[in-house]
Each structure stands twice: as structure tokens, then as C-alpha cells.
Amino acid sequence: MDIKFLYDNHETLKEQKVTIIGRVRSNRQGKAVSFMVLNDGTVLNDLQVVYKPETFGFEQGSKARVSSIVEIEGILIPTPTRPQPFEINATSITLLDQAIEEYPLQKKEHSPEFLREISHLRARTKTFQAIFRIRSTAAFAIHKFFQENNYVYVTTPIITSNDAEGAGEQFVVTVNEDKDYANDFFGKKASLTVSGQLNGEAFAQAFKNIYTFGPTFRAENSHTTKHASEFWMIEPEVAFADINDNIQLMQDMLKSVVGYVLEKNMTELEFLQEQLEPGLIDKITGIVNVEFKVNTYEEVLKTLQDAIDKGHKFEENNIHFGLDLGTEHERFICEEVNKCPTFVINYPKDIKSFYMKQNDDGKTVAAVDLLVPGIGELCGGSEREANLDKILERCEFYGINPEELDWYIGLRKYGFYKSAGFGLGFERLIMYITGASNIRDVIPFPRTPKTLLY
């Protein structure tokens, strides 16, 4: 029997004997009555236990420190006038394991910075229990959405020889201290993947609808609240699809996942709304209930310039074609102008990746970013370039050796008519849903520069 079972069935269990094992959150002694608060991790809500000097095992129970493990036998008593719907009047207490006095999570407020230093313990706090339970629900919801829509789940390689993003920020995998890659394990330079997209495109040509969901790695020496060296990516790919199909898929998937979390984790969301972000539930409910807007990149530039002309100040006021939009620009568009999630399409080709389809205007590509209030860019994707000559020309522009991607580029030789997909950073989505302000707080054991504690 666990605490979630008691909450789910407390009306039918009233006045009945129950047995529960849990971890002590607090233990307060009084002259006539003592109170112990337990949690076993199965539900965010705690369980209050009432015990008295005549309770069997009272001495053990009264000595139980915070984080100790106890077994409680007792009677479930309804408490409709109190914050919790019921409590347990203990008839027996057994101290199964006593925690040391120096347990770091005592009953007081702890800073996020301190809790990041004890990632192996912080999941025991209510805030992190709420965040990681929502993370679990959202991960399931992603698989649920794609499986119910006839997508094939593809596990793409973690060790790879390609840099899908062309940024060169990869972790090298080697067993050779001399970095002689020709004599290394794979006979060539190998790295941890930055994206499963290229491999996913190959499988989309076989199955039409595929998605990947797995870890990716970036050797980016960044210390911002949005960047981590290891994170998870969702990357669907659809053959015969264009940018409009891609936009619809982004919207459908996001609405489905957020809607599922709202259905399954309202208790956690209410707690996080109180602790982390007032208005959180209304914010994410807006994702489900509103229709997203679409603006072209050049429309966005005009809107930004108009705002500057009327006196608005950005940190970057030099608005020009080729500008890589900053978070301040993205948030202004979706928060102040459109007041809803916004797709921005048709970016300059020279600020986007080599594999994106070139538009007929010769200067833009069929790329799309989704901007959401409170965060800016949430995910991005594109229609893929199907023309062999054009993709070779883009490889040359970016200094990419086409021989290293011969298998990928060669897909265009064997029947290739459109393909589109996008990448969504899972942790960025969880930050948005939970109101967490730092990516380190939505990953169980975060990996960031100079930090590898576990």
C-alpha cells in the first residue's frame, strides 16, 4: 500500500486499518499528541500521522529524524475541515532506518544553487518532485502522440561521424591519447551526436512518419540558464511534407503534450504556480486553447523597426535582413504584438543550416521557428533541400566536405520528394511547462561546463 493509493481511495478506506512505509518530512512532538509527516514519492501530497505516548513504538517514532524511514500501522480518519482530506491515527510505529542528523535537506528553504550541488537528494523536495513527475508525464505524452498518429520511433546513433548542425561544437570520442584518428577505435574521428536529424531523414524515406527522442550533446562553453552540455531532443521527420505540414505538426504535438500534462498533473502545476511562476496554469492553458499565428521573417523585421521608430528600445536596435533574432525580439513579437505562440518562417539562408530548402526568392529558406510567450524560441525546423546540386552548393558555402556526408546527400539520388521536420529541446519544453527558470533544474543530473558530479 502506498500514499497515492490512500489518496485515491480514502473515502472507501475511512475508519479502516492501513499500513504504509514512508520517509519522514517532519516530526513534531507535543505533550499529549505528536505529528509526523510522511511522503513515499508516489504522490506530491504528504501524509499526516498522529501518534500518542500510548502508541506502540512511540519512543522509536519520537526519535525519527527527517528523512528516516518508518512503517506506520493505523486507522485512516477523514479530516474534511483541515487542509488534508484525511490522516492516520497510528497504532504502531516501526523505525526501519534512522537518517543521520547532518541530513542536508532539513525543513527550511534551500536555494536552487545549493540543491544543484546535491542532485542525488534534491528530487526528495516537493518542488523537484513536481518538476520531475511532470517531466515523466510529458515524455510519455510525446511517445503517446506520435504512436497514436502512426509514427515509427527511431533510435539514432549517439556516436557519430557527422555534425548535423555544422557548428563544430562536438565532444570527441576517442581511446587514442595521441588523437591519431586513423588508428583510433573507428578508424576516423568520432563524436557524440548533436542531433539525430540526418539519420532520421533516412528512415523517413522508408517509413514516411518517424520521430527520434533521445540524448544529444553540445561542447558549448556556455553558462546561461538555457544551455546544458547534455540534453534530450524530440525530432520528428515526415517524407513528402512541406513547411506548412511541419507547422501543423508542431502545433498539434505541442497542444497534445501540454494538454496531457494539464490533465494528469494539475496538483503539481498548482504547487509550481505557487512556488515558481504565478499564472503558470493560464499560460500553458493558452497553448492548448489558442490558434498560433504565422509571420514571415521579413514581416517580423518590419514590425520590430516600426516599434523602434515609435520609441521602443531593444538591446539590438540594428534591424536588418540577416539579423539572427534575439530572445528580446522573439518575445516582443509573441508577447507584445501577437500575444500568442507565433511561427516565424522564411529566414535568410545564410543564417540557417545547409540542409534547409532554398526558396524561389534565392535569399531565404523554408525554415520555421516557434516562439512562445515567456521564453521566445521553443523549437525550430524546416523543409529539407531535395535538389542535389543546391545542397552541394550549400555544403561548399559552409565549408562542409560532402564526402563526409555522402550517405546523407546521396539520399537525393534514390527518389527524394520533399521532407520536413523539426527539433524540440525537451528540457526547454519542461522549463516552459513547469515555470523553472534554469535548465539545470529540469534535468535529473545536469551536465554543464566544469560540472560533472555524478
From Swiss-Prot:
This is Asparagine--tRNA ligase. NCBIfam families: asnS, PRK03932.1. Keywords: Aminoacyl-tRNA synthetase, ATP-binding, Cytoplasm, Ligase, Nucleotide-binding, Protein biosynthesis. It catalyses: tRNA(Asn) + L-asparagine + ATP = L-asparaginyl-tRNA(Asn) + AMP + diphosphate + H(+). Belongs to the class-II aminoacyl-tRNA synthetase family. Pfam families: tRNA-synt_2, tRNA_anti-codon. Its main location: cytoplasm. One of its GO terms (molecular function) is nucleic acid binding. One of its GO terms (cellular component) is cytoplasm. CDD domains: AsxRS_core, EcAsnRS_like_N. Signal peptide: none annotated. PANTHER family: ASPARAGINE--TRNA LIGASE, MITOCHONDRIAL-RELATED, ASPARTYL/LYSYL-TRNA SYNTHETASE. Homodimer. It comes from the Bacteria. It is found in: Cytoplasm. It comes from Mesoplasma florum (strain ATCC 33453 / NBRC 100688 / NCTC 11704 / L1). Gene3D superfamilies: Bira Bifunctional Protein, Domain 2, Nucleic acid-binding proteins. Its EC number is 6.1.1.22. GO terms for biological process: asparaginyl-tRNA aminoacylation.
